[in-house]
Amino acid sequence: MIVAVGHDLIEIERIRRMLLREGPRAQKLFAPCELEYAARLSDPTPSLAARFAAKEAFQKVWPRPHGWRDVWVERERTPDGPFPFTPPVLGFTETIAEEMRERGWVAHLTLTHTKEHASAVVVLEER
């Protein structure tokens, strides 16, 4: 059963300006795995914008506030598959992960971006 759906749409240039303005402080919004993934790309900003949108989308379905680095987007490498990475999934701190397990919830994530916008949808499902 679907518990909640959260969506966020963000302008990539807004994230680019924030990263330039805040410098290293802006990196505190992202988990190390998110920064490592984005650093491999010729332009990391669209990827980081999509991850920012994922955090916002999750906040819209979660019953209380959480920190920026309490939720992150993970993508595992798949060197033998047709694509270099698996589909994105949400990762959580142990506190959030434990509450998800207790409630029987699973989070589904989809990300996309164009030249101008990044978007994320999070669906919480009760199993």
Curated annotation (Swiss-Prot):
Supply the name of the protein. Holo-[acyl-carrier-protein] synthase
Q: What class of enzyme is it?
A: transferase
The cross-references to Gene3D superfamilies, in alphabetical order and at most eight, read: 4'-phosphopantetheinyl transferase domain
Briefly state the protein's biological role: Transfers the 4'-phosphopantetheine moiety from coenzyme A to a Ser of acyl-carrier-protein.
Species lineage, top-down? Bacteria, Thermotogati, Deinococcota, Deinococci, Deinococcales
From which source organism is this entry? Deinococcus deserti (strain DSM 17065 / CIP 109153 / LMG 22923 / VCD115)
For the ligand (Mg(2+)), the binding residues are 8, 56
Please name the gene that encodes this protein: acpS
Q: Write the Enzyme Commission number(s) for this entry.
A: 2.7.8.7
The GO biological-process annotations, alphabetized, read as: fatty acid biosynthetic process
